[in-house]
Amino acid sequence: MSCRDAQNFITEYADMEVLRRYIQEKRREGVRIPYMTLILAAYFKAYQENPKINRFIMNSKIYQRNHFCVSFVILKTRADGRADETSIKVFFEDGDDIFSINRKIEEAVAQNQVAAHNNNTDKFANFLFAIPILPGLLFGLVKLMDRCGLLPRKIIDLSPFHTSLFITNLASINTNSIFHHCYEFGTTGVFVSMGKPIANYRSGEYNKKMIPLSVVMDERICTGHEYALFWASVR
């Protein structure tokens, strides 16, 4: 996102006790649902009620995305034993619910955590960095084509930065949530960072926990009122 002054920042909170009860209930039924999946399912449902959250800016014009996808990073172990990260992009469809969303995420994570597996995004990045002089030149060309709306569909499908939502679960590495900028490259309009649980100081029930969600939003894709309605739907 080239206009950094067009970003808004807010911290939302998810009641961990409510989420935990639901997770435990489903676990007794034989279904394992992570916290991040619950957040994503709530976000997706709220988007269906407030579709403008899925718009993006390209070349100073507002566009409505014709699909919904989410990008996130997972840790994996390479074939040589080194720890590494890989980006995943998962597409949701109108008929998806918490269970189909959970299944899609589980399948994507399982496939991309295989040591010998490089997803298409990994392969694209490996190609770029295979020739020392190529990355800078090619990235410059790709960014220019992106700004002009000339980027081929194949590259957009490979890019985790062309997404409805980018989310990171820092609680998984016992880290506080952060405000992560929306990327200069791509069409990410909202970035959500989940942090490690904190005491529920808002209600004064310090023995109960909340999950902080640090949110960075492109203010150009919808009005403040529309953002407020969207986050009310998420809650």
Regions found by a protein language model. Give the residues of each.
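C-terminal catalytic/motor cores of large multi-domain enzyme assemblies
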Residues: 1-235
